[in-house]
From Swiss-Prot:
Keywords: Cell membrane, Lipoprotein, Membrane, Palmitate, Signal. It is a lipid-anchor. This is Uncharacterized lipoprotein TP_0134. One of its GO terms (cellular component) is plasma membrane. Belongs to the TP013X lipoprotein family. It comes from Treponema pallidum (strain Nichols). It is found in: Cell membrane. The keyword Transport does not apply.
Length: 376
């Protein structure tokens, strides 16, 4: 049975509208005249999922994505298919989260609906009528972003959006918040961490298991987090060199960790530095200027390998990347791993693309068999 812990947040915040921009607003560049060359190099597939993508999650052995309705495919499958979920109810799914085999789909202002593979019913979660978004936390929990009513809303927090979080913390568009030691309550009371120097608006957040990263217009900030989730003594930051940043994700491959920063034209990459000696337990050292790359394709182990850089530049590198989704390989079904470390097995990489003409808007994936980017 699927019984995730679902929380409501006491801090009044509203719908994640900034993440649901029309694709025509994501970029204004004119890319006409280049696509014949692209098609000669790699045959671009017709999209399985039409239109802009607002979320992608893994639940059990399946992937789920939304363009307003729910779609699914097998983890190692090729084609996406629509799920008979909320059909005929005139409901638009704005965000997704997952816990075990359950998918939680938020219809902004209406509520959160739970879907489990193989079911046909649409079960609305209790006490979610004012949900504005559902967010997947780095520790596996699912958190709801809720407006608590007009009488509780103030101008200062009317545009605050929940972005992410993990053990002992939440990240919103206006700050980093620490949570009380007990997580059993339905409504969370949070305290803003004044040591976080990131200036609002915060655009996205990500976690690599040890550190939490926060994206702003010009910089990425890092908060060191040990296993107990205690407060760090330092923050560090670095300029990311990405124009008009939109998304942030952690990508691990062959024992190395990278931050991927989606922007107006493709995405940049920051290799996470490894602390030496005992310093890793007491100081924040992952972000260094020499490891910042304005675009991917600069090395063998990065998310787009160096040998695939040209094909990346002629496709993903020309369009806005508004979402980055890193999916760990499923190695339980007889697939042989290259190493006993999960960080050595290259994960699958998907991006949500926005093309000004909408011709190439949609979900794209890096194909490790051909080492090329192509549309899903």
């Amino acid at each position: 049975m699927c019984k995730p812990r679902v929380w409501r947040i006491a801090h009044t915040i509203v719908h994640v509208g900034a993440l649901l921009l029309g694709t025509s607003q994501l970029t204004t560049c004119d890319f006409s005249g280049i696509f014949a060359t692209i098609q000669q190099e790699v045959a671009i597939k017709s999209p399985s999922i039409p239109g802009a993508i607002y979320g992608l999650v893994k639940a059990g052995d399946k992937l789920y994505a939304t363009n307003g309705r729910l779609w699914e495919k097998e983890l190692n499958g090729i084609k996406w298919k629509p799920v008979p979920f909320l059909d005929g109810q005139d409901k638009r799914i704005d965000s997704l989260a997952a816990s075990n085999t359950c998918v939680f789909a938020c219809v902004s202002g209406d509520g959160v609906y739970k879907y489990t593979a193989g079911t046909t019913s649409s079960q609305k979660e209790s006490n979610t009528d004012k949900a504005q978004a559902v967010v997947q936390m780095s520790d596996g929990k699912v958190v709801l972003q809720c407006a608590l009513g007009d009488e509780k809303t103030t101008p200062s927090d009317a545009d605050e959006r929940l972005l992410g979080g993990g053990q002992g913390y939440l990240v919103t568009s206006k700050g980093f918040y620490t949570l009380p030691g007990s997580a059993s309550c339905e409504v969370i009371s949070e305290t803003k961490d004044v040591t976080c120097k990131a200036e609002a608006p915060i655009l996205a957040s990500a976690c690599d298991g040890s550190n939490t990263y926060i994206l702003t217009k010009d910089k990425v900030y890092c908060r060191y987090t040990n296993g107990s989730g205690s407060t760090p003594t330092t923050w560090c930051d670095v300029e990311h060199k990405v124009s008009e940043p939109l998304a942030l994700a952690v990508f691990k491959n062959k024992g190395e960790t990278f931050l991927l920063v989606g922007g107006q034209q493709g995405y940049g990459e920051i290799k996470i530095a490894t602390a030496s000696g005992s310093s890793s337990s007491s100081s924040c050292v992952p972000l260094t200027a020499e490891n910042v790359h304005a675009t991917t394709g600069w090395g063998a182990n990065c998310s787009t390998p160096e040998g695939s850089a040209e094909q990346y530049r002629s496709t993903i590198g020309r369009w806005a990347v508004s979402g980055i989704y890193v999916i760990k390989k499923d190695t339980s079904g007889g697939r042989k791993k290259r190493s006993t470390s999960t960080d050595c097995e290259r994960p699958d990489l998907y991006v949500a693309v926005g093309d000004a003409s909408d011709t190439y808007t949609g979900l794209w994936k890096f194909d490790t068999a051909t080492n090329t980017w192509n549309r899903e």
